Structures are given as C-alpha cells and as structure tokens.
Amino acid sequence: MNMGQAKSYSVIVIGGGHAGTEAALSSARMGVCTLLISHNIETLGQMSCNPAIGGIGKGHLVKEIDAMGGIMARAIDKSGIQFRTLNASKGPAVRATRAQADRILYKAQIRYTLENQDNLSLFQQAVDDLIIEHDQIKGVVTQMGLAFMADKVILTSGTFLGGVIHIGQRNFQGGRAGDAPSNALSGKLRSYDLRVSRLKTGTPPRLDNRTLNYSLMQVQPGDTPLPTFSFMGVKEDHPRQIPCYITHTNEKTHDLIRDGLKDSPMFTGNIEGISPRYCPSIEDKVVRFSERDSHQIFVEPEGLTTNEVYPNGVSTSLSYEVQLNFIRSIKGFEKAHIIRPGYAIEYDFFDPRGLKQTLEVKKISGLYFAGQINGTTGYEEAAAQGLLAGVNAACAILERDAWLPKRNESYIGVMVDDLITKGANEPYRMFTSRAEYRLLLREDNADERLTPKARDLGLISEVCWQSFQVKYEAITQEKNRLKNTWIQASDTQAGVVLNQNLNHEYSLLELLKRPKIDYQILSQIESGKPFLTDATLINSIENQIKYAGYIKRQLEEIEKYRKNENTILSVNIDYDSIKALSSEVRQKLELHKPETIGQASRIQGVTPASISILLVYLKTYQSK
C-alpha cells in the first residue's frame, strides 16, 4: 500500500452503477470534494439486466430522485425508446411511468453528467481494501496498492461482492458476465462483525433481432402523447420511439424446461442465495405454477443501434443447450440465435438492520452502504439509496443535519425504513403497496414533496427552482380560479356539456370533484374560460381536487401517528430489563435496536401494546 502519495477527498464512492453514480453526483452537487472509483470507467451507469427504467413503485422512486436533483430521470428521458404509463385507468396513487431504454444512450448520458460535474473526480481501479482505524473509516486501497484517504466512504458494490455466476452445472467467479468479482473487499467486510448472507438474481439470454419473426407476435406500442420522467423534461428530449412485442411460452417450452431441471443450479443445490420473489426465473415459474400452460414474454429491444433483444420473462440459469432449445420452442423465436446466454449470479449482501437511517454502518463510522449490498433489487431502488447516502455523507462533512426522509414524505423513506427496521430476507423490491400513505406519495407531486428540501440542501440549480415555483404558482392560481368561477343554473350550454341540468349554481371546483367530470369536460364550458392546456398541470390539479377528502383523512392519520413516531430510543436501553414486554418482543428489540418508536412499531411481532409499554418505560426512564 502506497500511503506516501495518498490523495485525500472528503467523500469516496466505490462503484459506478446506479447507486454509485447518484451517490457521487449528490455529494459533489453539495460542494463536497468527491471521488468515484470504478473498476471500469466504460461501464458507468450500465444496465446489467433489463433495459428499462420505472414501473409500479419504481417509477415513483425515479420521480423522487429527479425531485432531489438526481440524474436517472433526465438520463432516461434522453435515452428512452418507448414510454408508457402503467395503471393509467386506475387511481393516481398507483399510476406509474415506465420507459424502455437504449442501453448505449443511457450509459452515455450518465457518463457525460459525471464527467462534467464540478467537485467530482473519476478513477479506474478495483478497490481491494478499506482503511479502518478504531472502527472509523479512513480511506480505501485499490488493486494496485494505491491509497485514497477520505472521511466518508460509500460502498455501492452491486452484485460484485463474492459474485459467482451459474449457467447449468458450470459456475465461475464474476461480478456480472465479463467482469471480475470483488473477493478481496468481500473478505475484508466479512472480517468485521457484520451480518452477511447470500442473495441470487438472474438474467435472460439476449437474442439476435434479425433471427426473430415479429409477424407471429403481438405488437406493443408506446403511449401517445409521450410521458416524460423528469419534471424538467420535454418530449423533444426523447429519441426515436419503437415498439416492443409480446409472445408466450407453451407446453413444449415447459416440457423442455422440466427435462433440463436436472442440470439447473437452482434445483441441484448449487445456488444457496435467495431469489427475487417478484422476478422469478422461468424454471421457477414452470415449477411453482405448474397449472399454467403459458407465461408472457415481453420482447424488448436493447437500443436503436444494436440487434440485441431482451426477452423479459425468461430469466434462467439452465444450461446453454437447454436455453437454446426452449427459446426456439416459443412462437416467433423458432430460429432465434442467442447472443449471450442467460445466467444466475450469487453475491454477498449485508443485513441492512446494521445501518442507521442515513445508511451509515452502525459499527464502522463514516462507511455507508447503498444498493444491492443492502438486499434490494432494481436500478431504481439502488439509485434512491445512492442519492440518500451521498447526501448524508456530504451533510456529515459539512456538519449539517442529516436528511432522514419519513414514510409519509417519500417512497425513499418507506424503502429505507423497511430495510433498516425489517431487514431483507429476500431481494427487496419497491411497490406502491408498501406505502401506508400512497395517495400522498404520487408521481405527480414528488417535486412538491421533495424539491424544497433539495433546494435547502443545495442539490438543484436556480433554473430548476424557478421552474418549480412557476409550476406551483400556476397550479395555485388555477385552483383559486376554479374555486371562484361560478356556473349558473341557467347556463344551458354548461348543462349540455355536463350532460345534466344544474339545479343551482356551482363553482368549477365543485363540478370537478364529481367522478364523471374531468378538466377536459369543464374546459368546454364557455362561461368558465380560460382553461389550462398543460397536461402535467391539469393532472396535478385534478388529483388535488378529486381526492381532497381522502388526502385530508391521510394527513389527519399522519398527525396522530407523528406524536410518537419520532420519539428517540437510546441505543443504551436494556430491553431485557423491561419485564412487561414479552420475551419475543424483548429479543426482537434487542436484535434490531430501533432508533425511534416509529421504527420499533414496524418490527414484525412488536404489537401496539408493546409500543404502549415502551412509551410508559420512556416516561419513567426520562423522569429519573
């Protein structure tokens, strides 16, 4: 280790994936001298699995990252080749944006942003060791023995820690196909008293677009008009749009897969890591859902300038021979050529209950974990954690209060609270169902919830802040106009538009509250003009007005809960001494060491009665 020439930074980020890039950018945007170290600069922002961003719950995270000044939304707006709004016919809480990405364009956008960010330097080299003295991080050591010193280090290792790739009975070490694992760093972390386990994820074989018969498949076009991810985005940012396609497995496919299970590492015991529940391999689906005679496959192009296609829905670790046979049994894939075989990968992750709310490791001061190392799965979940870790590392350097988003403020807050309170016994994926207050945490109001905080932290530009102010001033003015514009009962034209006679005068706001009346219908009423034309503003206004009653109720629930939510629990509490608690609850509180009453209440098995006992104990404890 060459300490004599060691260069110092305030924050070092290890890893250039989705967590690492957001961590490095957020730290640097706050004015902190930051170094991003990646084993390969060419893979910054690489999409290792599916070429897509967003989806249910995930799209909400992307909007929140954007509201906090992150790059993911802007990058996908400039690289997305198909955009769709999922759950468009359902309520606003569960509507979500999803975009198919051109991998090459996406990666280029990320790298360009990193290379042009003030206060941020890049360095290519694998990190093999951490410099830790008296349980305090001091820096890192690269593969060639170079030392870089820093007060804060953020580890975003993805699937690289102890990574092992499986294809049939063959397995070999790797962080992903074509990349070496981080075994030395994994060994270093395992030497500390951190709870470590193994998880598994997988990816499907990539196919040659020229060998597929799309005439046998169902076309899946994108939405019109095109949505955007970034609040600063415009449709003109999007590159050329192209369709995806849909096909299905069949009984022959399933028979071939069943016959190949004898060589499947998942079913022979070679893989011990736990798989993602909501993204199972095709062999897992065939076994678990044996009554089904087909499974849907989304045929997704990987870009505008490549022939590679991603068959979403057939992730597999079966042998190459079995992969080729079952792929060619699928309609439209009869002559398919596999460019890259599918594989499964096992890797180390560390129990996120060993983290503070800031994502700092409790046992090693100054070290932060973000991304799959914490047991999550998905680009969006990783990026959100990276953003949070980067902000909090910078806050610590600047001696500012940490950013601790709450469950009622953001999906980022929901995710982090779930992780540090409940842990992850399987790869954690974000869904809207995980949020108690999801009507407050819509995609359309992510900027309203978070951009003022981003402004306070120094994460956004003046242009972004001014755009935000203009938007919400327009929304406020229009809501006031709707409230104060009255339609008379004698207005026959309004009656025709509304398809009902008015028995007395109504404000436009009152009319908009009705289930079958939307803003577009109201805009046809001559006496109510002028109306807005911006679809984004209209959507926000409709959601605020139509769901005002439900929103008010959720806010009241939050206020009741808030009284005790943030009550601090000292790390020195001896839970074994609180005999009024059951032994099970005492053990769980001792294991998890929750920082607040709110966290304690979300530990599985900790009942409301247990929380009441804790509150009584705290009052007694504080009075001594």
From Swiss-Prot:
<dbReference type="InterPro" id="IPR004416">
    <property type="entry name" value="MnmG"/>
</dbReference>
<dbReference type="InterPro" id="IPR047001">
    <property type="entry name" value="MnmG_C_subdom"/>
</dbReference>
<dbReference type="InterPro" id="IPR026904">
    <property type="entry name" value="MnmG_C"/>
</dbReference>
<keyword id="KW-0819">tRNA processing</keyword>
<comment type="similarity">
    <text>Belongs to the MnmG family.</text>
</comment>
<dbReference type="InterPro" id="IPR002218">
    <property type="entry name" value="MnmG-rel"/>
</dbReference>
<keyword id="KW-0963">Cytoplasm</keyword>
<dbReference type="InterPro" id="IPR036188">
    <property type="entry name" value="FAD/NAD-bd_sf"/>
</dbReference>
<dbReference type="InterPro" id="IPR020595">
    <property type="entry name" value="MnmG-rel_CS"/>
</dbReference>
<dbReference type="Pfam" id="PF13932">
    <property type="entry name" value="SAM_GIDA_C"/>
</dbReference>
<comment type="subunit">
    <text>Homodimer. Heterotetramer of two MnmE and two MnmG subunits.</text>
</comment>
<comment type="function">
    <text>NAD-binding protein involved in the addition of a carboxymethylaminomethyl (cmnm) group at the wobble position (U34) of certain tRNAs, forming tRNA-cmnm(5)s(2)U34.</text>
</comment>
<protein>
    <recommendedName>
        <fullName>tRNA uridine 5-carboxymethylaminomethyl modification enzyme MnmG</fullName>
    </recommendedName>
</protein>
<dbReference type="Pfam" id="PF21680">
    <property type="entry name" value="GIDA_C_1st"/>
</dbReference>
<dbReference type="GO" id="GO:0002098">
    <property type="term" value="P:tRNA wobble uridine modification"/>
</dbReference>
<feature type="binding site">
    <location>
        <position position="372"/>
    </location>
    <ligand>
        <name>FAD</name>
    </ligand>
</feature>
<feature type="binding site">
    <location>
        <position position="127"/>
    </location>
    <ligand>
        <name>FAD</name>
    </ligand>
</feature>
<dbReference type="GO" id="GO:0030488">
    <property type="term" value="P:tRNA methylation"/>
</dbReference>
<dbReference type="InterPro" id="IPR044920">
    <property type="entry name" value="MnmG_C_subdom_sf"/>
</dbReference>
<dbReference type="Pfam" id="PF01134">
    <property type="entry name" value="GIDA"/>
</dbReference>
<feature type="binding site">
    <location>
        <begin position="15"/>
        <end position="20"/>
    </location>
    <ligand>
        <name>FAD</name>
    </ligand>
</feature>
<dbReference type="InterPro" id="IPR049312">
    <property type="entry name" value="GIDA_C_N"/>
</dbReference>
<keyword id="KW-0274">FAD</keyword>
<keyword id="KW-0285">Flavoprotein</keyword>
<feature type="binding site">
    <location>
        <begin position="275"/>
        <end position="289"/>
    </location>
    <ligand>
        <name>NAD(+)</name>
    </ligand>
</feature>
<dbReference type="GO" id="GO:0050660">
    <property type="term" value="F:flavin adenine dinucleotide binding"/>
</dbReference>
<dbReference type="InterPro" id="IPR040131">
    <property type="entry name" value="MnmG_N"/>
</dbReference>
<keyword id="KW-0520">NAD</keyword>
<feature type="binding site">
    <location>
        <position position="182"/>
    </location>
    <ligand>
        <name>FAD</name>
    </ligand>
</feature>
<dbReference type="GO" id="GO:0005829">
    <property type="term" value="C:cytosol"/>
</dbReference>
